[in-house]
Every structure is written in structure tokens, then in C-alpha cells.
């Protein structure tokens, strides 16, 4: 009989000549990949362990399985190279039977995450961790066994097709891939059949009458099919009977009923562990996502662990699965995109949670839309349909991609990543973008694959503004976005970027080096930011009330604004036990509360309550703002001379002035240069240039400078210059 031996212990890790014992999962970038500076180690390290030859009967095979080695792996056994794998997120296997010696064997895995031009990803806003960060298993199988393919493909493939929704009739095709067997016995839901093996495959078809459907969060029911060989070898596989449809006007449809996909994206790493996470950590992530009420996850930007896909199957989350073909097309990387897509599909085919295969993410951010790029996407699209005719393809497009681009015609459904109201522009430009797209292409399905605003929960403000990294502005941002999305059910899927803060070692902003802080939950999973509860109010069926601002204790304003999120229809607010006001409404409740000292503020809704403590302060708490924004309260040296230009004037009008325009252009050009590829793409895109010009019509010079990340002293200095330039009368 076959057996699986876990090989996670007994490894020696070697980096630059230094040895240390490690247990898998392991990454060498758990610290330096999260601390900023963009200087984390990218190179080749090795993992070595002794491997005792297992007891093998005649015809038995020994197969090593690696579930995740980042980014390139070379496997050597007793000095002989037995395998090489390019891609850091998928499973690969190697048959080592003929390379094994009696007794002890030396297994060395060389792992490389260095910069190159052939293996994706190479350019993106997240850390490319190196290491063996998922399980390693030795499979010992008899001569007749279920196939353990090198590309990690499932040995039993299940294709359910709901042929009659009204009757809940589901036709289930089961294919078993075997070696050395003549037939396979299949069992499903009390039905049994036997099928002969032809060219390594046995195939059977079952019909389930009145099937129990896999119905998302409401009832994620899973069937189990069992395949058995005559020698007793058995393989069990879970699957779900469900029907996915995507309609340009109705959005996502599950089993015949509208089911708008509203949820989050997830990166797999976490503080202190990097990508070397445990199943318990995955379960914690899932519990947080479910608490918020999300019904979909975009598993970005690569293949995630099988254990997490299993959780999604069990809990009823609908999944967008994708490969790390991201940001920048590489001429020498075409083959790698196809390999990673093949592995993604053949390894995850049976998961009922997966609805779409993602071809790429923001691939035009640093690449031109040329024939080579288009051909690569066509090849990926064709491969996905060949390997899986049952699921549509999609891609996440960067905001500056024109909606008339030919690349949008390749996948079955599309989606856009937009950051209006954070990186650029105003919040209502998100509304305008999708309304324009939907009006121009009413027969195309469109989704919202990324949107978000960074928030450091230490930063708070009574006057939140774009670019201040406050938890308060993140709430303002998401309040607009949540309502905008709720008003547009034809958006087939929307995914907040991101559920959790994650490592991006090149970042140095918002008071935390090395982190992207757009998460609704902190990197260590310890703090649910206030915006988490906004989406809970929109999505969750579990009644609750949440008072925002628990970390905004010291307040200088005489009358403070208190925001409350709840999915209940009525909220009452109390100060020190006395009723302030009762409001009816939905999701967001705003109260104005006079404060004079230390107060307890409590929101009550039904049987639920939430309390925060506030303190009337005479001076702003400097810990509530970034150091370059602590003097923002007064940008001016004195009263403004209205006959001269100032940072309070309209940006478009100022740019049009012969004297002021060149001064501002020099500043905006400098800011654009600092943003590199993205800014260059905007400059070369007429549609985005026009969009920016429209944004300037509504922005002040001050607003544009803050958006560009200018510090307080620079803005004050510019205001002094502008106050010396008279306006033409």
C-alpha cells in the first residue's frame, strides 16, 4: 500500500556559507523582506537533509513532492540533479526511485529567488520571499498506483455539470489517471461503477438526481468520490455541484440566482513569518474574512496553498485564482507563464470554489500593449480553455489602460484596479469610470479587482484627507466605495485591496517601512481597522454595532464626530451613560458629540453595544500623524493676499497662468519621476492625461501637492513663492 512521509524536519539551511538547522516551512526573508529599504536578500541558498531509503517492494516507486519552493528549485540526490522547477507557488514532483542508494541519501535543494528575466514575478508591489515554505513529502507507491504527475496534477479529476437547475440534476464525469492498473472502481453517493483503463485514464459518468448544490456561504455542500484499484489503492476527492454564470447586466449568478461577489483580495504572508505560514494561520485568516461577511476572495497574485483552497471549498467562498504574470511583460518569460498557468489549473481543477482563472495583473503598468503581449495573453487564454472548458478567464487591468485596448477582448470577463481617491484623482472618478465603461460596453462583463487606501491605525484625524494614512481617511474612502459598489450590481465581482496588510520591502511610507497598509486588518492580524466593520455592516448577516475611533482618544475639537457602523436599522449614542441621539438608517451612522474632558461614548443597537473612550485635549497628539504632517494645521505664515496666487487656488487655473504654470509643472514633473513606470504610463496614455486634466479642474494646488506626497515645509515654501506672484486682473 502507498504511504506518505512528511519531510519537514531535519534540514540544514545554508546561506552564504553559514549553516543552521531549520524546520519547514521556512523562508530566509521573514525579517529582511518586511523591514523596508528594498534590500532583502535575493540569491541562492540551499537546504540539505539525510533521506533514508524507504522499504521498496518490487515495482514500488518513490516520489518527492514539493508544495512550494520560491522561486526556482534545483533538486539533487546523491550529487545527481533529479529535478528543476521554475515558479515559486505551485507543487512539483520528481520520481527519485532510480537515484536512491541503500541506506542514507543526501538530498540537497538549491533555491533561488534572485532577479532574472524568465521566471515570474520580477516586478510588483510585494516581497518575493525565498525558501521552501510549504510541505515536502515522500510518496511511496506500488507498481499499480494513481499517477503522481511531475506538474502536480490531481490524480482524480472531477467535472460536475448542473444540467437542470430546477430538478437539481448534476452530471458528474470522473477521470482517474493511473499507472500499472487495468481498471478503476468508482463510488459516488451510493452509486458504484467500474471503468477500464485506456492510455492511463479510466473514465466514468454519474448522474445525481436532486443533488444538493454547493451554494456559496449558504450551503457549501461537498460530495466525495472514491476511486479504487484492484490492489486496494484508494484515492478520494471532494467536489461540489454548482453553476456559475456572469452576466453584463445582472453580474454574478450562482445556481440561477443573483449572487454579487463582494469581498477581498488576500496575500498569504504575515508579520514575522513571511510566507512560511501554518494551517492554523490560514484558518485564522479565513475566520476573519468570514466574520466580515465576504463571499469572495481574489487569491493574489499567485497560487496559494492547497489547504486554503480547501477552506474556501468548505466555507463557500467563491475564488479568483491567478498566476503571477504581473506588472511587466518579459520577452523571455512566455514559457514560464504557460507553465504556471498549467500547474495552477491541473492542481486546482477540482475545487468548486474557483470560478475564474486570472491571466495577469496590471501587466500594462510597465509594458506596452504590443503584439507580443497580446499573443502571450491569447496563448494563456487558449491554454486555460483547453485545460478547463468549464470556467471563464479574466484579468486585472491597471487604471491607465484605455477601455478601448485590444487586450480587453482576450479574456471572457474583465476587471479593473482603480485607486481614484488615493493615489490620484477624486473618489467619484471611480463611479465615473465604471459608468462610462458600462455605457460604452453594455454587453461586456466588468468587475472591480482592486481598490483601497493605506491606513496606519496609529494615525487619526478630525479632518481626514487623501494621503494622510489615517485610519479615519480609510473609513471616508471605503464609505464612498462600499456605497458605489452596492449601487452597481452589474459589477460581477469586487475585491478590496487588501484584507490584510502585507510585505512590500520597497515601501517607505505611512510610518511603517516595508509594508503595504491597505489591509482592513493589520499585518499581524491583531487589529481590525475601523473600515473592517464598515464592510461587516454591508455584508454580514450577524447583527452587531461598532463605534469607530477607539484609537483616536485625544481630541482637540469641542464637538467631535463619532461614526458608528451597524447592520441594524437603528443606533442610539450615549455619552457617559446619557442619551445623545437616536438615528435610523443603514450601515453608517454619524453623530456630533460635545466633549469637555474624559468621556465614555457608547453606541447601542438592539442587544448590542460598543464603547470607546475619548479625552478633550488642548494640543494635537503628535503620535496621530506622520512627522511630515504634524505641522499641517497652518500652511501659511499669515493672512493670504487674495490678489496673489496661493495653494488654495484651483490647480487648473494656476497651471494656465504664464507665471505660475512653469513653477507647478516643475513640481509635478518631479513627483511623476518619483513614481517611475506608472507615472510614465500615465504620461503616454491620452485617456489618462485627459482624466488627470479633469481631476485638476476640481482640485486646489494644495490638494494636488498633498496627493503627490509633498511635505508640510515644501508646501509652505511654495505658498510663499505663489504669494509673491500677482494675479492678472
Predicted regions and their residues:
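Secreted/periplasmic carbohydrate-active enzymes, especially glycoside hydrolases
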Residues: 1-301, 316-319, 340-343, 350-356, ...
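Long, contiguous interaction/targeting segments characteristic
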Residues: 63, 69-143, 463-537, 667, ...
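Intrinsically disordered, low-complexity coil segments
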Residues: 142-168, 230, 509-512, 526, ...
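In a subset of proteins, long, contiguous C-terminal domains/tails are tracked
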Residues: 532, 537-540, 575-576, 600-636, ...
Amino acid at each position: 500500500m502507498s504511504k506518505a512521509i512528511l519531510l519537514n524536519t531535519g534540514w540544514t539551511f545554508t546561506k552564504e556559507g553559514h549553516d543552521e538547522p531549520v524546520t519547514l516551512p521556512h523562508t530566509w526573508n521573514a525579517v529582511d523582506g518586511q523591514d523596508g529599504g528594498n534590500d532583502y536578500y535575493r540569491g541562492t541558498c540551499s537546504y540539505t537533509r539525510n533521506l533514508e531509503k524507504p522499504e521498496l517492494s518490487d515495482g514500488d516507486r518513490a516520489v518527492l513532492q514539493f508544495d512550494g519552493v520560491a522561486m526556482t528549485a534545483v533538486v539533487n540526490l546523491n550529487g545527481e540533479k533529479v529535478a528543476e522547477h521554475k515558479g515559486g507557488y505551485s507543487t512539483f514532483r520528481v520520481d527519485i526511485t532510480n537515484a536512491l542508494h541503500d541506506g542514507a541519501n543526501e538530498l540537497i535543494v538549491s533555491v533561488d529567488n534572485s532577479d532574472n528575466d524568465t521566471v515570474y514575478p520580477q516586478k510588483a508591489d510585494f516581497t518575493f520571499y525565498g525558501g521552501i515554505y510549504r510541505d515536502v513529502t515522500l510518496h511511496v507507491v506500488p507498481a499499480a498506483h494513481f499517477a503522481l504527475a511531475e506538474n502536480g496534477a490531481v490524480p482524480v479529476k472531477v467535472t460536475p455539470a448542473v444540467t437542470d437547475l430546477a430538478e437539481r440534476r448534476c452530471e458528474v464525469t470522473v477521470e482517474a489517471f493511473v499507472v500499472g492498473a487495468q481498471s478503476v472502481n468508482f463510488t459516488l453517493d451510493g452509486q458504484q461503477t467500474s471503468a477500464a483503463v485506456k492510455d492511463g485514464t479510466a473514465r466514468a459518468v454519474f448522474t445525481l438526481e436532486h443533488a444538493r448544490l454547493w451554494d456559496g456561504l449558504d450551503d457549501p455542500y461537498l460530495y466525495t468520490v472514491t476511486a479504487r484499484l484492484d490492489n486496494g489503492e484508494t484515492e478520494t476527492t471532494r467536489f461540489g455541484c454548482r453553476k456559475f454564470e456572469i452576466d453584463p447586466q445582472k453580474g454574478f449568478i450562482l445556481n440561477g440566482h443573483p449572487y454579487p461577489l463582494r469581498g477581498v483580495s488576500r496575500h498569504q504572508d504575515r508579520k514575522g513569518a513571511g510566507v512560511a505560514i501554518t494551517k492554523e494561520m490560514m484558518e485564522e485568516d479565513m475566520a476573519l474574512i468570514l466574520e466580515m461577511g465576504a463571499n469572495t476572495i481574489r487569491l493574489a497574485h499567485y497560487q496559494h496553498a492547497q489547504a486554503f483552497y480547501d477552506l474556501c471549498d468548505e466555507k463557500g467562498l467563491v475564488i479568483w485564482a491567478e498566476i503571477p504574470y504581473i506588472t511587466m511583460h518579459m520577452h523571455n518569460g512566455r514559457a514560464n507563464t504557460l507553465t504556471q498557468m498549467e500547474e495552477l489549473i491541473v492542481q486546482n481543477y477540482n475545487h468548486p470554489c474557483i470560478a475564474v482563472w486570472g491571466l495577469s495583473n496590471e501587466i500594462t503598468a510597465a509594458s506596452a500593449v504590443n503584439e507580443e503581449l497580446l499573443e502571450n495573453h491569447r496563448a494563456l487564454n487558449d491554454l486555460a480553455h483547453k485545460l478547463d472548458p468549464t470556467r471563464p478567464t479574466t484579468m486585472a487591468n491597471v487604471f491607465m489602460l484605455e477601455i478601448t485596448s485590444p487586450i480587453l477582448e482576450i479574456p471572457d470577463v474583465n476587471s479593473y484596479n482603480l485607486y481614484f481617491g488615493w493615489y490620484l484623482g477624486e473618489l467619484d472618478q471611480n463611479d465615473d469610470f465604471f459608468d462610462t465603461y458600462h455605457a460604452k460596453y453594455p454587453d461586456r462583463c466588468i468587475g472591480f479587482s482592486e481598490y483601497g487606501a493605506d491606513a496606519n491605525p496609529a494615525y487619526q484625524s478630525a479632518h481626514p484627507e487623501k494621503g494622510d494614512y489615517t485610519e479615519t481617511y480609510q473609513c471616508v474612502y471605503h464609505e464612498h466605495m462600499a456605497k458605489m459598489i452596492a449601487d452597481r450590481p452589474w459589477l460581477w465581482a469586487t475585491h478590496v485591496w487588501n484584507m490584510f496588510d502585507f510585505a512590500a520591502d520597497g515601501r517607505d511610507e505611512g510610518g511603517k517601512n516595508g509594508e503595504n497598509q491597505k489591509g482592513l486588518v493589520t499585518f499581524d492580524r491583531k487589529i481590525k481597522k475601523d473600515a473592517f466593520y464598515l464592510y461587516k455592516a454591508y455584508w454580514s448577516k450577524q447583527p452587531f454595532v461598532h463605534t469607530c475611533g477607539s484609537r483616536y482618544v485625544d481630541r482637540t475639537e469641542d464637538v467631535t464626530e463619532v461614526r458608528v457602523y451597524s447592520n441594524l436599522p437603528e443606533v442610539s449614542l450615549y455619552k457617559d451613560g446619557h442619551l445623545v441621539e437616536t438615528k435610523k438608517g443603514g450601515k453608517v451612522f454619524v453623530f456630533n458629540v460635545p466633549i469637555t474632558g474624559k468621556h465614555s461614548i457608547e453606541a447601542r443597537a438592539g442587544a448590542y453595544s460598543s464603547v470607546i473612550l475619548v479625552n478633550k485635549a488642548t494640543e494635537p497628539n503628535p503620535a496621530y500623524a506622520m512627522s511630515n504632517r504634524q505641522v499641517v494645521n497652518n500652511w501659511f505664515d499669515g493672512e493670504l493676499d487674495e490678489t496673489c496666487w496661493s495653494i488654495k487656488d484651483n490647480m487648473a487655473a494656476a497651471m494656465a497662468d504664464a507665471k505660475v504654470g512653469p513653477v507647478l509643472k516643475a513640481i509635478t514633473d518631479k513627483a511623476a519621476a518619483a513614481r517611475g513606470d506608472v507615472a510614465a504610463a500615465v504620461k503616454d496614455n491620452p485617456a489618462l492625461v485627459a482624466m488627470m486634466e479633469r481631476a485638476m479642474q476640481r482640485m486646489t494646488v494644495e490638494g494636488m501637492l498633498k496627493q503627490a506626497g509633498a511635505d508640510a515645509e515644501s508646501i509652505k515654501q511654495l505658498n510663499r513663492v505663489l504669494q509673491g506672484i500677482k494675479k492678472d486682473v
